[in-house]
């Protein structure tokens, strides 16, 4: 997904000066991209990331914020894993780090959602939470009918916490579960743009909005074409029906047709594809479209009355069976 890669690269380069904001982003990345593991009776913190740039950012923050040393290993693409991933692991001091980042509670139990201090922090810290979640497990699809900014979550509690964090940023997000996988999704185009800006993807949001506008212009053009096609089809059907009924009216009335009504009927049959307005211009002297329509209407009414009186098929008898397909 090119858009996802663009967003993640830009977010991985966002410069943050406040320690609390950096810590909020890092803790969320660790929560959404890995977890706690027991290795040789020691708690290890692991984070599986999809770009080397993000892996360097995480290792830098681990060292500068918590003074811990981390190892990195490359997981090559294979089988279900479509791309190379980078595993950042903290073994020495892993439990202390887990406590400091809020991944472990006071009773040494792994948290189920997000650390409380993250979801109740400042707006800048909440934005960092979303930035971290997207860097760890987010995707952005192209603008269109199925456009979405989506984050895969480690569980329902984490998903609900992320929805609440979005609300703090005035962005509407929804949690959903599909085949046991919990996700938080933003589908509204304006909301997606707002979240991208809040997270710090200023460059990508410009490209995304341009793509969105182009899609909307194309969609509007297609709707107009379809609208015009439908109008043309209806006009063609109306012309065919009118000509068929006028022909039948001429048959029913024969020589009894008043001259002014016969003239209007002849106009209709001579210029079959013309509109009523155009028929009026063809008349000599010219007539208004209402005058033409009125004469044709009276011609048909007179013919239908005679058909009823004499037990004959009316003017509808000549209508083509496949009229709707015209």
UniProtKB/Swiss-Prot annotation:
GO biological process: cell division; regulation of sporulation
InterPro entries: Homing_endonucl (IPR027434), Sporu_reg_WhiA_N_dom (IPR018478), Sporulation_regulator_WhiA (IPR003802), Sporulation_regulator_WhiA_C (IPR023054), WhiA_LAGLIDADG_dom (IPR039518)
Keyword DNA-binding: yes
GO molecular function: DNA binding
DNA-binding region(s) in UniProt: 275-308
Entry similarity comment: Belongs to the WhiA family.
Top-level lineage group: Bacteria
UniProt KW keywords: Cell cycle, Cell division, DNA-binding
Protein's organism: Clavibacter michiganensis subsp. michiganensis (strain NCPPB 382)
Keyword Cell division: yes
Protein name per its UniProtKB record: Probable cell division protein WhiA
Summary of the function given for this chain in its UniProt record: Involved in cell division and chromosome segregation.
């Amino acid at each position: 997904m090119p858009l996802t890669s663009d967003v993640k690269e830009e977010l991985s380069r966002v410069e943050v000066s406040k320690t609390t904001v950096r810590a909020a982003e890092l803790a969320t990345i660790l929560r959404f991209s890995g977890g706690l593991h027991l290795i040789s009776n020691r708690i290890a913190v692991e984070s599986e990331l999809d770009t080397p740039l993000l892996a360097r950012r995480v290792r830098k923050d681990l060292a500068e914020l918590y003074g811990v040393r981390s190892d990195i290993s490359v997981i090559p693409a294979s089988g279900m894993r479509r791309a190379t991933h980078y595993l950042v692991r903290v073994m020495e001091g892993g439990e202390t780090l887990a406590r400091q980042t809020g991944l472990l509670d006071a009773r040494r139990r792994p948290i189920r959602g997000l650390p409380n201090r993250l979801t109740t922090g400042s707006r800048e810290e909440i934005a960092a939470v979303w930035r971290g979640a997207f860097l760890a497990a987010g995707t952005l699809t192209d603008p269109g009918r199925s456009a979405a900014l989506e984050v895969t979550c480690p569980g329902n509690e984490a998903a609900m916490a992320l929805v609440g964090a979005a609300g703090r940023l005035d962005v509407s997000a929804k949690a959903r579960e599909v085949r046991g996988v919990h996700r938080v999704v933003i589908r509204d185009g304006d909301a997606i743009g707002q979240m991208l800006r809040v997270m710090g993807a200023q460059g990508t949001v410009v490209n995304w909005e341009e793509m969105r506008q182009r899609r909307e212009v194309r969609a509007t053009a297609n709707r107009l074409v379809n609208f015009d096609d439908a109008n043309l089809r209806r006009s063609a059907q109306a012309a065919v029906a009118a000509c068929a009924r006028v022909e039948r009216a001429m048959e029913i009335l024969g020589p009894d047709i008043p001259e002014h009504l016969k003239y209007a009927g002849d106009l209709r049959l001579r210029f079959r594809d013309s509109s009523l307005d155009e028929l009026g211009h063809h008349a000599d002297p010219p007539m208004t479209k209402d005058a033409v329509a009125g004469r044709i209407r009276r011609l048909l009414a007179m013919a239908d009355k005679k058909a009823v009186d004499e037990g004959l098929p009316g003017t509808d008898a000549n209508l083509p069976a496949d009229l709707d397909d015209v």
